[in-house]
Regions:
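Non-heme di-metal
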Residues: 2-321
Length: 321
């Protein structure tokens, strides 16, 4: 069997999540176990804990201040979400309707567990002792876990953990509602830490390369399901609407504002390090504002969701996310 149908991008010139999802035409059959083994061998080659060996956390990220606090908050939260995603995936592996789909979600489960691990390890690299890491993460994430992540987890468990598990509903949760909705923040993370914290940017880039595959295949699994079961065209959009309505009810915006305000304050302190580095073409990161970066993530969310809905065959669906 040839694996040349889809080539995993080299980490040095990998696409962004946005561009990657626009181009992705992936299936569980293409992204099988052998493909995954070769893909991670390529994308993680030479890396230790998700980044180039010897690439140290810069001194300014080790010193107390808003920039460090922004990073600690972000990576503690992301490590927690990835851990919860891995647990959700165990239900998809258990209930997958065929071998190819089961194998794919098994690889995604390992990917998400790896993401959680490298995010946690970055906190250690930033000076948090391993012995107190879990307690410190719980302190950093705080009530955000109960206010944001627990309701999402319960929404997902209501789909996949019951005896008559809704497998395709669980896939939609990951692809549109849960992991898919978090993807814009992941894209922003890779871009905004590239100068301030190169190890963090490499870690984020590696995770984002995986997410292109996860979201692309997830959309294809839903598309194929709808093709086989056209009667689901009525139920699945309603499920997406309920999930996105839940997002609107959760305190996501205050979390983003808090994180971006810390980043903004840190950026003001260390502006000279950025030079002319651009967040997006034609726009220097040093010139961006809290509102602009949050607005950009909202724009990316709409764009990426639209791409996935088109791929799923749900182009007539109107959602407010």
């Amino acid at each position: 069997m040839t694996l040349a149908m889809v080539k995993q991008p080299e980490k040095t010139h990998s696409p962004s999540l946005i561009d990657g999802l626009a181009d992705a035409e992936l299936t569980p059959e293409i992204c099988n176990l052998e493909y995954w083994l070769q893909a991670i061998r390529c994308s993680l080659r030479g890396y230790v804990h998700g980044h180039t060996p010897g690439l140290a956390v810069p001194r300014h990220m080790l010193e107390p201040g808003p920039l460090r606090e922004a990073s600690l908050q972000e990576f503690a939260f992301r490590a927690t979400t990835e851990q919860m995603t891995a647990r959700h995936l165990s239900h998809l592996v258990r209930t997958a309707p065929d071998q190819a789909t089961m194998d794919f979600f098994a690889t995604q489960l390992i990917d998400e567990a790896r993401h959680a691990d490298v995010f946690r390890w970055h906190l250690v690299e930033m000076g948090i002792p391993r012995a107190t890491l879990e307690a410190r993460m719980a302190e950093i994430v705080g009530n955000k876990r109960d206010a944001i992540l627990r309701p999402l987890e319960q929404f997902a468990l209501d789909l996949v953990a019951k005896p008559d598990a809704d497998f395709i509903g669980g896939v939609i949760f990951l692809t549109v509602i849960g992991e898919g909705a978090l993807a814009p923040a992941a894209e922003m993370s890779e871009r905004k830490w590239r100068v301030f914290d190169p190890p963090a940017a490499e870690i984020a880039q590696g995770a984002n390369m995986d997410e292109v595959r996860h979201l692309g295949v997830g959309a294809e699994v839903v598309r194929a399901h709808i093709e086989r079961h056209p009667q689901e065209r009525g139920r699945l959009p309603e499920l997406i609407q309920r999930g996105l309505q839940l997002w609107q009810e959760l305190p996501i915006l205050p979390l983003l504002i808090e994180r971006e305000m810390l980043f903004q304050a840190g950026m003001e302190q260390h502006r000279s390090l950025l030079g002319d580095y651009e967040l997006i073409p034609g726009r220097r990161l040093a010139d961006t504002t809290v509102e602009e970066r949050i607005g950009l993530q909202a724009h990316w969310a709409d764009e990426m969701r639209g791409q996935r809905l088109v791929r799923m065959g749900l182009t007539g669906l109107t959602v407010a996310g």
